[in-house]
Amino acid sequence: TKGTKMSKKALILTWESYQDHEVVYPFYRVQEEGFEVDIMANKLGRIFGILGTYNECTQSVFDLDDEKLFEKHMNDYDLLIIPGGVKALEYLRQQQNALRFIKEWDTKKKTIACICHGAQLLISSKITSGRDVSGYYSIKDDISNSGANYVDGPAVISNNLVSCPHYKWMGQWMKAVFEVYESGNG
């Protein structure tokens, strides 16, 4: 309702040169479900995807280096979205506190929505072992070698984690994300 504050908050964790579809669609889709949404990346303000679209980044990934801000972000958000983008993930997976954030988020059983190369962050966060995980076909071996069971499906659910291999299945993926979120598995 207009004028009332939304209570649910989603955080999209990415870096410049993200896969455009995988940021733009979830950004608007979560708002349709009543979430406020912020993008956390390597710089504040306008950031660009690999196809040239842009979004406004309102949170800095470097905030996670400050323990008070780390905890604030952990407590402020209800849903974590990890989009793909090969170059973006190469940089983001080098940010140790971003990886620690994902691991702690998972430990708290909060919902994680991950798509395409975003699975590389799951691997680097060491949360894939023993789980069903999907991701882009070119990282299938990486997913399997991390101890996960690679599943090539549009919306792979493993407890609080919902993963997807490709943006062509974003509709099914986001539907599953909201089901997991609402069920309390996240």
How would you name each of these model-derived features?
Residues 133:
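Anionic-ligand binding patches
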